[in-house]
């Protein structure tokens, strides 16, 4: 989906080479994020992304002098532009990419921008900011379409429609490289042998489906190494979520039949699978094998649970993605439904960034090209609005998929009903987001009034750290703004300093803030809009909130003063006596402490910010701790020798199940006393600071 080596790049209006998108970002001074992993948590709440920032619509007309300069740069480009297909990039004087477009005839398209009249305000503003034009020639218009989508996603130009929060979709994989196939969730490249089923809209949907599939088909979910090490069935066999092929509880033909049934169900032959199970249940009952009949009954119930979770399932559509777009209040929402093998595998709402002057058809057309830039398309794509160049898009996607892809806007029948259902969801999702945004804006105004800020903060960063007696220490930053929590900009910081005293919360906070603000100070492109859209690092916060008391505030203030920062406002939030919510104390530099009424909406808002930071940092800490526990096994549990370790593993099967066990369950293990059970439970459930 990128241009090949035969493409020719021409630099118009500048002596610099065009370079790759990554090169262009490096040239603008944007370094890759080094600090942290932004994808530390997967939740269903991520399915609806935040509303994008809308570029301000100017009231006055664009000044004639900048327009004339921009047209001159474009006219210069026209004289050297090819009449063949290609992609062009409008760039400002700072080398930021303003717009990426494609054309069947590049010279003709650029000529339309050089006309002195007839431009809409959005185009006029873009022309006025243009200082140079870059052109990449392509062999065909289809190549130009694919390259345009790729560049928009990478460069995030200001005047393009931008697909936001486009994380990869999860799949279900039934492996094909082991005699006893495994059932698991999969993201990323589909390189492992086996059958892939998806995409699913969220990790939560996949997790629920896999759990139900285990109950219905008893296919294993353990790793191959764990499978090979078993001498007795694990807990999943005991609770009837695995057939136990690892220890011969089921033979090869029997397990193969279960895998085939699971594959058939995921492939759309669910009715036949359910009929076979119903017949087997009736036969077992007739043979007075009531325990076996009950097993078939439970498997049928698990299949029914899967289908009830899926909601609407089409009768005549086997494989399709359904897109519907709704516009309201200057914002757009695109709702996407995924149908595979006649089953609804979930939906997701997107809120693309686009100026108000774009039409829904324009936004949807650009959205689709970017959406399938890194995803395999289905054979049928159903749309709520007719888009320009739908045939060109279908041709490009057909080449990508290796089969014919149809892009259609249905007018009647079940396909029309599916689109209408998606449109209803788009309308409701955007309504919820607009309501949430209005509430958020009022709360930010109240926060600004409380703190004496000149205007409501557009970016609030909240910091917290977590550890257990200094071990697995981690700091975290969450971000909030007028659109709510910006989860794609959350960051975590593994505490690195070897000189830090274990458990020194103030030193941990200083390290986190120093790393964050020093990175901001070293960013050469802090004011680059493209960089700000790409990454959180170049964006300065208007307000920093610390989870802690006066000591944490002083630690943060020391960092800010040492770095000479005057633009960042600080506040610390200390929990009330007995850590009661509603009795918090707010600490500000050089001001008396503030205590708000328990029912004050602004206090509730501050609590939400603080609690979200706490949730995120605790999750990050637990991931580090679980990793250490997995690597160390039960060796680190005090008072647990080899005999008790074997007893625990024999009883529960896996370390994960031991970690999940209740105190009462641990006490049932032979050789484990009440005192040992308490010690084990406390080890796995120690509360981080």
UniProtKB/Swiss-Prot annotation:
Organism: Nitrobacter winogradskyi (strain ATCC 25391 / DSM 10237 / CIP 104748 / NCIMB 11846 / Nb-255)
Gene Ontology annotations of biological process type: nucleotide-excision repair; SOS response
CDD domains registered for this protein in UniProt: GIY-YIG_UvrC_Cho
Pfam name, any one: UvrC_RNaseH
Bias-annotated ranges (Polar residues): 1-19
Keyword Cytoplasm: yes
Predominant location category: cytoplasm
UniProt protein name: UvrABC system protein C
Self-association state and partner proteins as the record states: Interacts with UvrB in an incision complex.
Function: The UvrABC repair system catalyzes the recognition and processing of DNA lesions. UvrC both incises the 5' and 3' sides of the lesion. The N-terminal half is responsible for the 3' incision and the C-terminal half is responsible for the 5' incision.
Record flagged with keyword Hydrolase: no
UniProt-annotated location(s): Cytoplasm
Region (Disordered): 1-59
HAMAP family documented for this protein: UvrC
All residue ranges annotated as the GIY-YIG domain in the record: 83-161
Domain UVR as annotated: residue spans: 271-306
InterPro entries: GIY-YIG_endonuc, GIY-YIG_endonuc_sf, GIY-YIG_UvrC_Cho, Hlx-hairpin-Hlx_DNA-bd_motif, RuvA_2-like, UVR_dom, UVR_dom_sf, UvrABC_protein_C
GO molecular function: DNA binding; excinuclease ABC activity
GO cellular component terms, A-Z: cytoplasm; excinuclease repair complex
């Amino acid at each position: 989906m990128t241009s090949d080596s035969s493409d020719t790049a021409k630099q118009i209006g500048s002596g610099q080479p065009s370079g790759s998108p990554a090169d262009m970002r490096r040239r603008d001074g944007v370094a890759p994020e080094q600090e942290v992993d932004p994808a530390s948590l997967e939740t269903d709440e991520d399915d609806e992304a935040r509303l994008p920032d809308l570029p301000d619509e100017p009231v006055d007309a664009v000044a004639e002098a900048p327009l004339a300069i921009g047209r001159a740069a474009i006219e210069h480009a026209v004289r050297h532009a090819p009449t063949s297909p290609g992609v062009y990039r409008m760039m400002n004087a700072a080398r930021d990419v303003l717009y990426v477009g494609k054309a069947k005839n590049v010279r003709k398209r650029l000529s339309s921008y050089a006309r002195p009249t007839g431009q809409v305000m959005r185009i006029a503003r873009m022309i006025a900011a243009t200082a140079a034009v870059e052109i990449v020639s392509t062999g065909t218009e289809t190549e130009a379409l694919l390259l345009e989508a790729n560049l928009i996603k990478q460069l995030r130009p200001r005047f393009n429609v931008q697909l936001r929060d486009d994380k990869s979709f999860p799949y279900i994989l039934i492996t094909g490289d082991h005699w006893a196939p495994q059932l698991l969730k999969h993201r990323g490249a589909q390189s492992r042998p086996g059958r892939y089923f998806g995409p699913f809209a969220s990790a939560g949907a996949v997790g629920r489906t896999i759990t139900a599939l285990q109950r219905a088909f008893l296919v294993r979910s353990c790793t191959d190494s764990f499978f090979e090490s078993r001498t007795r069935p694990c807990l999943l066999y005991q609770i009837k979520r695995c057939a136990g092929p690892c220890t011969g509880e089921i033979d090869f033909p029997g397990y193969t039949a279960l895998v085939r049934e699971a594959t058939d169900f995921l492939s759309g032959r669910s009715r036949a699978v359910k009929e076979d199970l119903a017949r087997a249940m009736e036969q077992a009952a007739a043979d007075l094998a009531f325990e076996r009949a009950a097993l078939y009954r439970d498997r049928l119930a698990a299949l029914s649970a899967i289908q009830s979770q899926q909601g609407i399932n089409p009768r005549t559509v086997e494989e399709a993605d359904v897109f519907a777009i709704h516009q309201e209040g200057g914002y757009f929402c695109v709702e996407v439904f995924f149908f595979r093998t006649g089953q609804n595998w979930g939906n997701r709402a997107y809120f693309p960034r686009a100026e108000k002057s774009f039409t829904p058809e324009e936004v949807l057309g650009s959205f689709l090209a970017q959406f399938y830039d890194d995803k395999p398309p289905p054979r049928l794509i159903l749309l709520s609005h007719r888009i320009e160049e739908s045939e060109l898009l279908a041709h490009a996607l057909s080449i990508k998929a290796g089969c014919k892809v149809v892009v259609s806007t249905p007018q009647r029948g079940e396909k029309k009903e599916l689109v209408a259902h998606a449109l209803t969801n788009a309308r409701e999702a955007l309504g919820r987001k607009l309501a949430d945004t209005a509430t958020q804006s009022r709360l930010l105004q109240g926060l600004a009034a409380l703190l004496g800020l000149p205007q409501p903060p557009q970016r609030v960063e909240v910091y917290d750290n977590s550890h257990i007696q200094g071990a697995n220490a981690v700091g975290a930053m969450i971000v909030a703004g007028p659109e709510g929590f910006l989860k794609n900009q959350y960051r975590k910081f593994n505490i690195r300093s070897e000189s830090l005293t274990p458990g020194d919360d103030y030193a941990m906070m200083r390290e986190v803030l120093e790393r964050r603000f020093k990175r901001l100070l070293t960013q050469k492109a802090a004011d680059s809009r493209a960089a700000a859209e790409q990454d959180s690092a170049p964006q300065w916060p208007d307000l920093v909130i610390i989870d802690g008391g006066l000591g944490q505030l002083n630690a943060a203030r020391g960092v800010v003063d040492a770095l000479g920062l005057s633009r960042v406002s600080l506040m610390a939030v200390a929990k009330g006596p007995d850590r009661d919510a509603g009795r918090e104390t707010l600490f500000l530099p050089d001001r008396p402490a503030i205590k708000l009424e328990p029912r004050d909406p602004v206090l509730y808002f501050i609590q939400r910010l603080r609690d979200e930071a706490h949730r995120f940092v605790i999750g990050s800490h637990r991931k580090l701790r679980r990793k250490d526990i997995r690597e160390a096994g039960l060796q680190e549990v005090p008072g647990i020798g080899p005999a008790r370790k074997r007893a625990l593993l024999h009883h529960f099967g896996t370390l994960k199940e031991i970690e999940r066990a209740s105190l009462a369950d641990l006490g049932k293990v032979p050789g484990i006393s009440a005192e040992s059970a308490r010690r084990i439970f406390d080890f796995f459930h120690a509360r981080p600071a």
